[in-house]
Amino acid sequence: MNGRKHLCIALFLSVIVAACTPVSKKALRAYAETKEDVSVVADTPTAQQDEPSGRDGDDTQADGEGGEGYELPAFRTSSDEIILKRKGYTASYNPTTKIPNWVAWHLTAEHVDGYAKRKGIPFHEDEDVPEPRVDTYDYMRSGYDRGHMCPAGDNKWDAEAMEQSFLMTNICPQDHVLNIGDWNNLEAQCRQWAEQYGSIYVVCGPVLYNKRHKTIGKNKVVVPEAFFKVILRMGRTPQAIGFIYRNNDKRHPWGDYVNSVDEVERITGFDFFASLPDSVERQVERQVNVDMWPIQALH
């Protein structure tokens, strides 16, 4: 649809492996290096990993060289997943919950500014996912904002990227106070970090704590109980930080939201920054040093 390539997962770089087994690091990077927009339905187990589990079978450098795909979590078959590669981000969309499992992108200093404007761009359904599709009417009179996961402010560098950020597969029902307040402040802080460090790798998405969830609209879009965001910066000493924000109107000091990436992985069940060398991944995810993340927009 719309000229995009639609590729069955079994034929696309062997991205998905045996059930509940994460994709290999090399396959993640190969996927990240594809330039076209694609949709990949992740429902078919295929090849085995091309590196033994538990080894640093990776030639990625800790200083950021060869870092294509650092932002991608491990693809899995343990939950409904359609992988959507867009110009400015990659999304794992869940056709059951009607919201993304996660959205990931590489935010560079060059991407935080540009001439692409959000004014006049409507939220619109994503024709690359099967019906029934979420549309903007599902949110009408729901009491929730259409909350971007990859924010429009991170896509000012390109008009197509900006337009794609308004696809409903990049959107979750979000409390209004959170959307315009603490969550918006975190988005602004990420852009400042990208400018300060040259680039960062970001993953965010909904947190579903409960067994049963509130839904909105005729398509029964699931309302998350919280949202997560994890951020990686490379360099001589790679650092990572995680955040959990409850989906409500309560405001807190920024430090109350901070978590290690390991803790966010425990809460969400995702394996973040899966293409990093294992030793680097373990190091940056184990703990967070807030002193290594100077803040300006989070006060």
Where are these regions (language model features)?
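Domain-level detector for secreted/extracellular nuclease and nuclease-toxin modules, and
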Residues: G3-C8, V15-H299
